């Protein structure tokens, strides 16, 4: 069974030494948060990135109730003895206050965010499979999924590249909030927040209260229309003209109740089967047994009768402003810089750009080749007899090294196949021909001189043909 204990290398977690180093600047965790959340009151309230949509939701709830209380509910005060008609207004106000409280509890709390790791987990060792490993081999690729046993049923858990962790069962990564959320249900655009383990019950109560509020306003608007019909002995159409506010509320609540009422029934079904909206839409348990199903009673008790899970994040805790990522070791050796750079890119929420690493490696190779080309001048320091014997060989090696180098330099920073090498190659060949001619004059072997000239022509033809075909290092 796979162990999923929380890692001590999570973002914002204190170090094992008891805190951060004394020289680092300390900030609150929420100020350096890498997700897209919006924080208020010093990190005490946690909203999603689209928190402004809450204002629209509040308006759609409160505006109809205000209209109801002014134009409809107030008319019922004198219709009951001992001013019992005030209870009509009191119930409406109570429902809307309860609805707004559940809205705040849903949208302003941590939905169950899983803290992200500072770097990827250690790869599984190959011990026991007979495959030898070198001390400085590159870091192996992490498997995309792993198996975990839940109530005797195998469940696959996935690796999150952004958070650099294996997500627990039923968790998923929200692309809007940029967080992994435990028991992820969905991201609600009306509340601007993810719905997960820590706020699902409050979300359901919010939807239920909204449904009851719509039904309540809808019913009492019809009662008020009926009261006008009976008191003035007119038909329903004329009564509508007497109270246009009631007609508007009847139409509005009728439309809304189809949405919030249908949502309430849908989540009642999900709770009875212990599913999430995300799991239901993916048809995850259509052909497989649900390992989390505890029966109807057990499922409802799990939602409403259990303690709210403690948040894994301390948003007000002081941490280092930019925590340094310690270098990884692979079997006792330090990891390569390219792997460390990829880890940093993932931690910053950015996909690794592989061509940057390639350009760095090409830069190192280019420096080595420059050093190799510069060594041709050492022949001038040799004794005359050795210089004469090695002149032709040295010119050949120099022409090869510089030919490759020029092709790389001319292609650097270009995307197409236009190399434009002719002018630079001609100049280099002219310089080398002069050098070879001097060596040929000192040497009695004229045949070697002719062979060297033929070699330069072949190099020129090969380089220009590579430029026309668009192949070579420049195509990287």
Swiss-Prot record:
- Compartments, record wording: Cell membrane
What keywords appear on the UniProt entry? Acyltransferase, Cell membrane, Lipoprotein, Membrane, Palmitate, Phosphoprotein, Transferase, Transmembrane, Transmembrane helix
Q: Does the keyword Cell membrane apply?
A: yes
Tell me where in this chain the DHHC domain is found: 158-208
Q: Where is the active site?
A: 188 (s-palmitoyl cysteine intermediate)
Its domain of life reads Eukaryota
Show the Pfam families listed in the entry.
DHHC
Kindly list the GO molecular function terms attached to this UniProt entry: protein-cysteine S-palmitoyltransferase activity
**Which residues in this protein are found as Phosphoserine?**
336, 418
Q: Which family does it belong to?
A: Belongs to the DHHC palmitoyltransferase family.
Under what name is this protein listed?
Probable protein S-acyltransferase 5
Q: Which organism is it from?
A: Arabidopsis thaliana (Mouse-ear cress)
